[in-house]
């Protein structure tokens, strides 16, 4: 008969749980646990609002953070346009359900996950993301929420926090992770700057010109090489 263990016989939490875990270091004493932080739209999947603009024929919905760096200004413009045309959340979701990841994106994410922890840091919304994230194998996604009324009209949005991509990188670094980040637009640049290494991917010329401190590449093969170059581990393609 198995011996009974009483509460008094067990110290909880266990003593080991109170001992800080040692950092996992490489041969030269650098943190060897690395997180790859990626933007979503324009990097792994099409720009959702551009796809919706093409479907509806509403040219003004094509604007993204590549065009309007202030995300609050951009979203208020989008919500106003949706309201003017009587478009609901379901209308946007119907278009999203037809989209596929960019060519090579699924293979790239699989390649990355074999070598890094992978987190998607995006200014998209959970109400948009599921069809595309399913095709990417559901990597971790940190993003925002939309607020709708009882008629499915999008009335507002809830940001996770101010400058959320940079704040996420700061939080990961506080846990002693080393961060390599990739993005394509203005709203990614604070994340890239806070990361241990930042990479522009599929970025337009104006963003590349304004942020020459970041290497800029345009294919997934080039992006793999930049991640290998930025890592403090010996990695291969």
Swiss-Prot record:
It catalyses: O-phospho-L-serine + H2O = L-serine + phosphate; O-phospho-D-serine + H2O = D-serine + phosphate. Substrate binds at residues 47, 78, 122-123, 165, 187. Binds 1 Mg(2+) ion per subunit. It is an enzyme of class 3 (hydrolase). Its EC number is 3.1.3.3. GO terms for biological process: L-serine biosynthetic process. The active site is at residues 39, 41. Mg(2+) binds at residues 39, 41, 184. SUPFAM superfamilies: HAD-like. It comes from the Bacteria. Pathway: Amino-acid biosynthesis; L-serine biosynthesis; L-serine from 3-phospho-D-glycerate: step 3/3. Belongs to the thrH family. This is Phosphoserine phosphatase.
